[in-house]
Amino acid sequence: MSVPAAGATRLLLLLLVAAATPSRARGSGCRSGAAVRGVGVEGREGEGCGTVGLLLEHSFEIDDSAHFRKRGSLLWNQQDGTLSLSQRQLNEEERGRLRDVAALNGLYRVRVPRRPGAPDGPEAGGYVSSFVPACSLVESHLSDQLTLHVDVAGNVVGVSVVTYPGGCRGHEVEDVDLELFNTSVQLQPPVTAPGPETAAFIERLEMEQAQKAKNPQEQKSFFAKYWMYIVPVVLFLMMSGAPDAGGQGGGGGGGGGGGSGR
């Protein structure tokens, strides 16, 4: 092989190795769990390895209307079934508005999209939401628990929010206690319903049939089972009908004798 040809071959090999190196780097990042789907601000889907992001929004308005804003981001690892939450603190305007809503017995609402990682629009599939009295959130110092209910297809079918402690007792709360959320999150996977006990039912029927075959006493006819009740009834009817038959015969004989005497 000539020198120029050997040099061209080595150059081609170097180019192939260089092209394969970024691919391995990307693969190692995925294996290490660095890639996440839907972790952006909008909770949209990107490349990932089994982790999806959900945008958590909340709403608390003076007129009790629903105007949702971002509260934080939920990260759901679908491989190990874990759920985590990152959220921002309330600013001064939001703290004041939350106090006003609580004073008016208004509601504090939360919502998450039904389809994790789905873009906004018709494909988003809508939202699931929940609410608590705003006064209970204020008096709990923003301590709440979020539970995410999911189905086997990986869709969100429900969300619930509760405050600790719950209830509204009219306690005074300092402004510093309404800055940071103290939230615990929980993932509620689908519960498999128990299947019909067909096999157990068939086995029980077979055992009953085998027991009847071993005990022929249960195979007797109706008369064989209840003859001790039937025979006395028949004898009683026969004996009670005998005098009536004799009386009818005597009356017939008397009539015949009177006729012969004429």
Curated annotation (Swiss-Prot):
One of its GO terms (biological process) is positive regulation of endothelial cell migration. The keyword Endoplasmic reticulum applies. GO terms for cellular component: EMC complex; endoplasmic reticulum membrane; membrane. It comes from the Eukaryota. Its main location: endoplasmic reticulum. It is a single-pass type I membrane protein. CDD domains: EMC10. Residues 1-25 form the signal peptide. The chain crosses the membrane at residues 222-242. It holds the Pfam family ECM10. Residues 243-262 are cytoplasmic. Keywords: Angiogenesis, Endoplasmic reticulum, Membrane, Signal, Transmembrane, Transmembrane helix. Residues 26-221 are lumenal. It is found in: Endoplasmic reticulum membrane. Part of the endoplasmic reticulum membrane protein complex (EMC) that enables the energy-independent insertion into endoplasmic reticulum membranes of newly synthesized membrane proteins. Preferentially accommodates proteins with transmembrane domains that are weakly hydrophobic or contain destabilizing features such as charged and aromatic residues. Involved in the cotranslational insertion of multi-pass membrane proteins in which stop-transfer membrane-anchor sequences become ER membrane spanning helices. Belongs to the EMC10 family. Component of the ER membrane protein complex (EMC). This is ER membrane protein complex subunit 10. It comes from Bos taurus (Bovine). The lineage of its organism: Eukaryota, Metazoa, Chordata, Craniata, Vertebrata.
